[in-house]
Swiss-Prot record:
It catalyses: S-ubiquitinyl-[E2 ubiquitin-conjugating enzyme]-L-cysteine + [acceptor protein]-L-lysine = [E2 ubiquitin-conjugating enzyme]-L-cysteine + N(6)-ubiquitinyl-[acceptor protein]-L-lysine. Its EC number is 2.3.2.27. GO terms for biological process: protein ubiquitination. This is U-box domain-containing protein 31.
């Protein structure tokens, strides 16, 4: 938990002398002497440990923090040196043989630990105040989310768009609102707004909410209706960049569902829209969600064939140098999947950048990338051995393969590299191939 930095004048120097003064001086709040008085029934007394675990506070007064664990104290005790620690932590310190104060390193002339009741009360009061305020805000947020859902159920036209926009803001700002929307049947209400006649204004707001909610299997099944997927595809092509990203992410979550049907994503419009996101050089935030969805759908044969037909192979190959590690792994996975189809292998062979771009990635990014790249190179070199192997060797493949073989990579990857190296050597004399394998001209 983050620790509040003490003030330059030393704060309390580790001592709490008077609870009333501490409250008055603003330790419990904003320094104006005002604070929330927490009154609890003894039977319903708030548990300090529970409050600390539930509250995610960016700042906590340093006087509440145990110097050993750097966590808020629940049972503070003070040593003869005047330093205060969490009881369990200081007892562990003593049990391992230490007889000094952890902070000052002074020899202890007395190992007695004295409960610091004043500090404990101050800690309890401070956390209680924060906890009660958090609960009150949560109730306010829940009430607001329920109110907006009620409005949404009967709203029409611009009022519907306004209600969705308000709900989106609440959902994105408060985790409790997401749960409230789900618990109150909001997923069904919002999903029912998606139809062939839905305007993009309504659809984009609805999808922005849905993509931020926890969806169960029934909710996903409802969203997998062809008309709703079709609307998402339309907005992926024609919406704003934020809407396109949300559509890609939401469809990606549906694809993972057990009952998902491949024909729902075997769509020319969907794949073209995703490739537009991948190629968009001005707005790169859409690349990762697009490639992630392409990776998920490329396991289906009909999708692979359609990807080849829309010209995805050279487009994906050409963007490889611009991608980060995560995106590279997804793009190479897709290209490797396309090698399963004869048309895909031909398209990879015919793309002028396939060999130089994939060779350049070997041993440079990650083992996954190296694995996919070698698999792609194997497919194209096997298809046109003399033409592709010679080109690959000329751009440094042989030396890179030797590095893979000598590395600590997976044995199966090293075996595939050895087989590819052997395939490349068939079109050279021994002396010529050995010269091509020299490491001096590789690995920038």
């Amino acid at each position: 938990m983050p620790m509040f930095q003490p003030s330059k004048n030393g704060g309390f120097d580790g001592h709490i002398l008077d609870l009333h003064s501490a409250v008055k001086d603003g330790v419990l709040g904003g320094g104006d002497g005002k604070f929330l008085v927490v009154v609890t029934d003894e039977k319903k007394k708030l548990d300090l440990k529970e409050m600390i675990s539930e509250l995610e506070l960016p700042e906590i007064p340093s006087v509440f923090i145990c110097p050993i664990s750097l966590e808020p104290m629940q049972d503070p005790v003070t040593l003869c040196t005047g330093q205060t620690y969490e009881r369990s932590n200081i007892l562990k310190w003593f049990n391992i043989g230490h007889c000094t104060c952890p902070t000052t390193m002074q020899e202890l002339w007395d190992d007695l630990v004295t409960p610091n009741k004043t500090l404990h009360q101050l800690i309890y009061t401070w956390f209680s105040q924060k906890y009660v305020l958090m609960k009150k805000r949560s109730e306010d947020v829940q009430g607001r989310a329920i109110e907006i859902l009620g409005t949404l159920r009967k709203a029409k036209g611009k009022a519907k768009v306004h209600a969705l926009s308000e709900l989106k803001q609440v959902v994105m700002a408060h985790a409790i609102a997401k749960k409230t929307v789900v618990d109150e049947g909001g997923v069904f209400v919002i999903s029912s707004l998606l139809s062939p006649f839905t305007s993009h204004a309504v659809g984009s707001e609805a999808i922005a909410i849905l993509v931020n909610l926890e969806l169960d299997s029934d909710s996903k099944a409802g969203l997998m209706q062809p008309a709703r997927v079709s609307l998402m595809v339309d907005m992926l092509n024609d919406g704003s960049i934020e809407t396109k990203i949300n559509c890609a992410r939401l469809i990606g979550r549906l694809v993972e569902e057990k009952g998902f049907r491949a024909e729902l994503v075997s769509s020319h419009s969907l794949l073209v829209g995703l490739m537009r996101l991948v190629k968009d050089r001005r707005r790169r935030n859409g690349v990762s969600p697009a490639l992630t969805l392409l990776k998920s759908v490329s396991v289906h044969k009909q999708v692979r064939n359609l990807l080849v037909r829309i010209g995805a192979v050279p487009q994906l190959v050409d963007v490889l140098p611009c991608l980060d590690v995560e995106c590279l792994e997804s793009a190479l996975f897709v290209l490797d999947s396309l090698c399963l189809e004869s048309e895909g292998r031909i398209a990879l062979k015919d793309s002028v950048n396939t060999i130089p771009h994939t060779v350049r990635l070997l041993m440079k990014v990650s083992e996954k990338c190296t694995n996919y790249a070698i698999s792609i190179l194997w497919s194209v070199c096997k298809l046109a051995s003399e033409e592709c192997s010679s080109l690959a060797v000329e751009v440094g493949l042989a030396a890179k393969l030797l590095l893979v073989i000598q590395s600590g990579c997976d044995p199966a990857l090293k075996q595939r590299s050895a087989e590819l190296l052997k395939l490349c050597s068939l079109h050279y004399s021994d002396s010529m191939f050995i010269s091509k394998c020299k490491l001096t001209r590789t690995i920038q």
